[in-house]
Design a protein with these regions (language model features):
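Tandem CBS (Cystathionine beta-synthase) repeat/Bateman regulatory domains
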Residues: 1-171
């Protein structure tokens, strides 16, 4: 890599020029063009472009411990809590397991998930942009955002699914 300051030919990946010690950081990192590439796709592509896997669906009275076990078995980071009418009333996440369920102590087997879940999470629509999901995750410090599908079902956009979407695209 040529140093833009002195012209010295440095090894690829060097942080500083061996000759003049100027920073070479970020010189070989591709930049996103605000009018194309990853930025445009994240801003314009809707959430239907993300990998959509079925999620764990539970009822408010289900045992929080049982829900956590279902999440572990299915390798999911959250469970959506739906009432009998199929309305989203909560989300129960790995964070809830670590912070709330564990602190429930000996009575953990008796705690219903609706006492520990995050109530009334706002679900995005499939037609919302990937950027909308990223914004919700960043602002709320969430790793999972519910998505309401047109057919009435729910799926989850996770930070992992967003990163996979970005990584798989041919920019």
């Amino acid at each position: 890599m040529l140093c833009p300051s002195c012209g010295h030919d440095n090894l690829e990946g060097m942080d500083r020029c061996d000759n003049c010690m100027k920073s070479l950081r970020d010189l070989d990192v591709p930049r996103a063009d605000a009018t194309g590439g990853v930025v445009r796709s994240v801003m314009e592509d809707d959430l239907s472009r993300l990998e959509q896997e079925e999620t764990v669906i539970v009822r408010p009275g289900d045992s929080a411990l049982g829900v956590a076990q279902s999440m572990k078995e299915s390798r999911k980071g959250c469970a959506l809590v739906l009432d009998d009418a199929g309305k989203l009333v909560g989300i129960f996440t790995e964070h809830d397991v670590m912070k709330k369920l564990i602190s429930a102590g000996e009575s953990v087997r008796d705690v219903p998930v609706d006492q520990l879940m995050t109530r009334n999470p706002e679900a995005l629509r499939e037609t919302d942009s990937v950027a909308a999901a990223l914004n919700k995750m960043a602002m709320g410090r969430y790793r999972h955002v519910p998505i309401a599908k047109d057919d009435g079902r729910y799926v989850v956009a996770s930070i992992t699914s967003v990163l996979r979407y970005i990584a798989q695209e041919d920019w």
